[in-house]
Amino acid sequence: MSVQEQKKKAPRDNGAPDHMKNLHPLMLKNYGKWKHYEKVRTGVLKRVAESGDVLYVVRAGSPRTMSIITMRKICDIADKYCQGHIRFTSRANVEFLIGNEKDVEPLIKAVEKDLGWPVGGTGASLSNIIHTQGWLHCNLPGTDAAGSVKALMDELFNDFITENLPQRVKISTSCCSINCGGQADIAINVQHHHPPRVDNKGVGVCEHPKVVAICPVAAIRPSMADGKASLEVVPEKCMYCGACHGQCPSMEIRDAQTDTLSIWIGGKAASTRKGPSFMKLAVWGLPNNAPRWPEVGEAVKKIIEVYRTGARPYERLGEWVERIGWKRFFELTGFPFTKYHIDDFKNARATLNTSSHVRL
């Protein structure tokens, strides 16, 4: 292909855009040559380059779902103090990048006054809670993830603006059992307690092969109802995840009378110490009590308090539980231990303690 033909081609429009052109000038200048960073205070980091350049990072907790008016306020602050450079973290924190030390305090005051947001979330603190769409946008929410995050962060506000925990704590909330919020130290998920109810009239407009294929445990199969093609659920196989409802709204699994919330703990993605780990059930059957979810807030605060007093420095929540044993964890929290806490999946043997070292 000639040079002229290459110039006529449209710019690439797939994949991630080139991030280099959006970096702060100091980040671009010292790319790959950073020496160390220092903690100035909770929410403020000082990054020092080999060249001696210093870049300050101010982290503020955002509500994630924002109006265009709020976005313009963020941009105005960034234009005034950060040469127009900000970035969002994976947990919806906003990080303002500052090259001049004298602009740090004025920026913090502007964030707290104009946006009403707290500065924090670094080091051994509670980071912003990651959550799924909830009632705002998701097509199968059993609860409002965004609303529960607001209620929960009101209760845990001081842990965001101070570093008084043994190690960082990450919380996620998911509006359904599929757990789009991902692995976290503490995760709040919806629990359904019965298989989906099939509406034979409405299910006819759904693509049956897709609905059958999306079930992770092969609990859905074709059937006939009133002489027409339909679907049926095998109750013995169904694990009440609700994935089928996303493919076919006529397979309704949500139930305001029976749906509850559960709390899972010990998940992490970091490779430190024992490496990444999945979450395990801590407490289930909590009422889906909108709009403040007080029972969930009390349970989460109880977990954080026993972790705060019992864990060693730099020990993540799941690592602390593994060290003291789950029996001791249930004693400290007062949560009831039930048969539903025991992993009875067919491949559960890989997760069970098979050594002779048992804490009694």
Q: How should each PLM-predicted stretch be described?
A:
Residues 268-311:
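A hydrophobic, small-residue-rich beta->alpha segment in the mid-to-C-terminal subdomain
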Residues 132, 170-177, 317-330, 350:
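A glycine-rich phosphate-binding loop feature that marks nucleotide/adenosyl-phosphate handling sites
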